[in-house]
Regions:
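Extracellular/luminal Protease-associated
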Residues: 79-175, 179-181, 347-348
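Soluble metallo-hydrolase cores and metallopeptidase-like ectodomains found primarily
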Residues: 85-111, 169-248, 259-274, 296
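Acidic/histidine-rich catalytic neighborhood of metal-dependent amide-processing enzymes
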Residues: 242-328, 429
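Acidic, glycine-rich active-site loops and adjacent beta-strand->loop/helix elements
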Residues: 152-153, 212-214, 240-243, 278-286, ...
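Active-site-adjacent substrate-binding region
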Residues: 318-437, 494-512, 516
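C-terminal non-catalytic alpha-helical accessory regions
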Residues: 413-417, 422-562
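Noncatalytic luminal/extracellular "stalk/propeptide" segments of secretory-pathway proteins
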Residues: 2, 8-13, 20-121
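Second-shell loop/turn segments in exported
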Residues: 2-9, 23-32, 100, 122-129, ...
C-alpha cells in the first residue's frame, strides 16, 4: 500500500491555529460561542479547498448554571459546588436531613436495595458516586437530593451529566429524567462535610439549590466529505462542543480531524473509499445528541455504505504518553497495533472493548468497525476518565497549556496510518473469527455471574455453530473482497447488535447500560435475594433477551448458509 505521511510543517500550523481560536471560546452547544466555533471550523476547511457544510440538528439541552449546599445548623459552613446536566432545576432549594451512603460504590442484592430505599427516602444523600443508574435509584426511592463527593484529590470541580437517555428523548424517555437535584463537591470539602456529620449527634439538616437551563436549540453540525472511487466511506468524528474552553476535550480532536481532511483531500485520487468527517454538537449537554441525530437521519446510508467509525476524543494531552485503543473487537489487532508501532516503536499498552460513551451511537446502524484512540499518563493521579487522565478534565482549567503538540502530532500520524489502510486497501481489517471467540469468552464470563436459572447455553451453542462458517467466509472475503466482503460486514454488524445493544436498531440503550450483552447484565444477581416482583421481571427480561439473541444468531446462520 502506498502511504503518504502527513507533513508536520503543513498541518501543525493549521491545527495550532484552530486550538488557539478555540481556546477563547466556551463551546457549550446552543451558545453563541459554539455556533461561532462551527462557522470558524467550516471556514477554515473551505480556505483549504474543502467543500464543508453545516447540517442543522435540533437538540434538547440541559445547561448547568449553579449549585450550592448549605447546612441548616452550621451557617458558616461553606463549599464550592456544581450541579449536573439534566439534574432537576430547583432554584428555590430543597431541604432535608443528610444521609451518608458509605457503601454507594459496592454491589447490593435486590433485598439490600429495598432496605436502602427506605433509608434514603426523604433524605439528601451524600455518596462517593453520582452515576446515572444510582441517581435513577435515588429518584425511585424518593430521595430529596444527592451530594456526590469526587473521589480523587484535585480541588477543581468537574462538569458532568446525570441524564440517563442517549441522545434526544422520545415521549416515553422523558419520564426518566431525574426529579431530584444533584450537585458535586470536591474530596476535600466532602471530607469536611462527613466530619461534620460524624461529630454531630442529631441528623445534620441541609439545603440544596440548583439552577439549570433546559431548552431546545438548533445546533450546527459541520461535515466534510472527500469522495473515493466507490460509494463506501469511513466516518471520522469528534465533538466540537465542550465544557468551558475544553482545549483537550475536545479542541485537540477537532484539530486532528481538520488535519486529516486536508491530508486526504491531497490524496483523493488514490482513495478507494471516501472519507466523511463530522464534528458533533451536543456531546456534553445533550448526552451525545449530535451523533444520535446523525444516526437517526442517515441510518440507511450508514448501513449501506459506512465501513468504519473512528471517534477522536481528547488526543494530544499533556503527560498522556501511553497509547490505549478502545475497539469493538471486530478489528484485526495487527491492523490496530501496526499504526501505533510504526509511530511509537511499540504496540498499544492495551486494546479494550468500547464502553458506554464517546459518541458511540452507531451500534444499530450496520457499521462493522468502531474504534478510538485513548491515551493515559504513566502514573494516574486523578479519577478523571478523559483528557488523557488529566485532572483538568471537564473543568475551567482545560486550557491551551494542557496540550502537548508533540503528542498531538503522534496521534495525528497514528490516525493517518489507520485511515490510509481503510481508505485505500480493498480488504477491510476485519477479524470476525477472533471477534466470535471473544464473544464466546465474554458470554462464559457473564454466565458465571448469573443465577443458574438464567442459562445462556442455547446462545453459546449458536455461537459455537458459527465458528466454521465464519472462518470460511472470512477466508473468502480476504481472497475475494469484491464478492464476499459485504456478507462479512453484515455478519459482523449483527454480532455488534448482539454484544453492544439490547434493543432494536431504531432505539438506544440507556446511557449507563453497558458491558457485553447489555440486556443480560441486569440479571447478574442472586435470585434467592430478590423479591418475587423483581424475580418475575428478571425472568421476563431473560426470556425476551434470549429470544432476541437467538433470532440475531439465526439470521447470521441463515445468511451464511446461502
Amino acid at each position: 500500500m502506498a502511504f503518504f505521511a502527513p507533513v508536520y510543517e503543513q498541518l501543525m500550523p493549521v491545527m495550532n491555529e484552530l486550538l488557539l481560536a478555540y481556546s477563547s471560546l466556551h463551546r457549550l452547544s446552543g451558545s453563541e460561542d459554539a455556533e461561532h466555533a462551527a462557522s470558524l471550523l467550516v471556514n477554515l476547511l473551505r480556505s483549504h479547498g474543502l467543500e464543508a457544510r453545516l447540517e442543522q440538528c435540533p437538540l434538547l439541552l440541559s445547561d448547568p448554571i449553579t449549585g450550592s449546599l448549605t447546612l441548616t445548623d452550621f451557617p458558616d459552613w461553606q463549599c464550592q459546588a456544581k450541579t449536573r446536566s439534566f439534574s432537576a432545576h430547583c432554584p428555590q432549594g430543597v431541604g432535608a436531613a443528610l444521609y451518608y451512603d458509605a457503601q454507594s460504590t459496592l454491589a447490593r442484592t435486590d433485598l439490600e436495595w429495598q432496605a436502602w430505599a427506605q433509608q434514603v427516602e426523604g433524605k439528601i444523600v451524600v455518596a462517593d458516586q453520582g452515576f446515572e443508574d444510582y441517581v435513577q435509584r435515588l429518584d425511585a426511592a424518593r430521595a430529596v437530593g444527592l451530594v456526590h463527593i469526587w473521589t480523587s484529590a484535585e480541588t477543581a470541580l468537574h462538569e458532568e451529566t446525570v441524564g440517563p437517555i442517549w441522545g434526544t428523548p422520545t415521549l416515553e424517555d422523558a419520564q426518566r429524567y431525574p426529579r431530584l437535584p444533584v450537585i458535586s463537591i470536591n474530596q476535600r470539602d466532602g471530607q469536611r462535610l462527613l466530619n461534620t456529620m460524624t461529630h454531630t449527634r442529631l441528623p445534620v439538616g441541609a439545603e440544596l439549590r440548583t439552577e439549570l437551563a433546559r431548552h431546545v436549540r438548533t445546533c450546527s453540525l459541520p461535515v466534510v466529505e472527500i469522495a473515493g472511487q466507490s460509494d463506501e466511506f469511513v466516518l471520522l468524528s469528534s465533538h466540537y462542543d465542550s465544557w468551558h474552553e475544553g482545549v483537550t476535550d475536545n479542541a485537540t480532536g477537532n484539530a486532528l480531524c481538520v488535519a486529516m481532511a486536508i491530508h486526504f483531500q491531497q490524496q483523493s485520487a488514490m482513495l478507494r473509499r471516501g472519507l466523511r468527517i463530522a464534528w458533533w454538537p451536543g456531546h456534553s449537554n445533550a448526552r451525545y445528541g449530535g451523533s444520535t441525530w446523525y444516526a437517526d437521519n442517515y441510518r440507511q446510508q450508514l448501513g449501506e455504505r459506512c465501513v468504519a467509525h473512528i471517534n477522536v476524543d481528547s488526543p494530544g494531552c499533556l503527560n498522556a504518553v501511553q497509547v490505549v485503543i478502545n475497539a469493538s473487537g471486530a478489528e484485526s489487532n495487527s491492523f490496530l497495533n501496526h499504526a501505533v508501532e510504526v509511530i511509537t516503536g511499540k504496540p498499544a499498552l492495551r486494546i479494550t472493548p468500547l464502553g458506554k460513551g464517546g459518541d458511540q451511537s452507531f451500534w444499530g446502524s450496520g457499521v462493522p468497525l468502531h474504534f478510538a484512540l485513548r491515551e493515559v499518563p504513566i502514573e494516574k493521579t486523578s479519577d478523571s476518565p478523559g483528557s488523557g487522565g488529566g485532572w483538568w478534565w471537564h473543568t475551567e482549567e482545560d486550557t491551551y497549556d494542557k496540550v502537548d503538540l508533540n503528542i498531538l502530532w503522534r496521534d495525528c500520524q497514528i490516525h493517518a496510518h489507520w485511515l490510509s489502510a481503510l481508505l485505500i486497501e480493498p480488504s477491510l481489517p476485519i477479524d470476525a473469527v477472533d471477534y466470535l471467540e471473544n464473544n464466546r469468552q465474554a458470554l462464559r464470563q457473564l454466565q458465571q455471574r448469573l443465577d443458574p436459572e438464567f442459562s445462556l447455553e442455547q446462545i453459546a451453542q449458536k455461537l459455537r455453530d458459527l465458528q466454521d462458517p465464519i472462518a470460511h467466509l472470512q477466508h473468502l472475503s480476504h481472497s475475494h473482497p469484491d464478492r464476499w466482503q459485504s456478507i462479512l460486514v453484515r455478519t459482523v454488524a449483527d454480532l455488534h447488535r448482539l454484544r453492544y445493544s439490547s434493543t432494536d436498531d431504531f432505539h438506544y440503550d440507556l446511557s449507563y447500560r453497558g458491558g457485553a450483552f447489555p440486556g443480560f447484565q441486569p440479571l447478574a444477581a442472586d435470585l434467592g435475594q430478590t423479591t418475587p416482583e423483581t424475580a418475575l421481571m428478571m425472568q421476563t427480561q431473560y426470556r425476551r433477551q434470549c429470544d432476541r439473541a437467538l433470532a440475531l444468531l439465526q439470521k447470521i446462520s441463515d445468511r451464511l448458509q446461502k
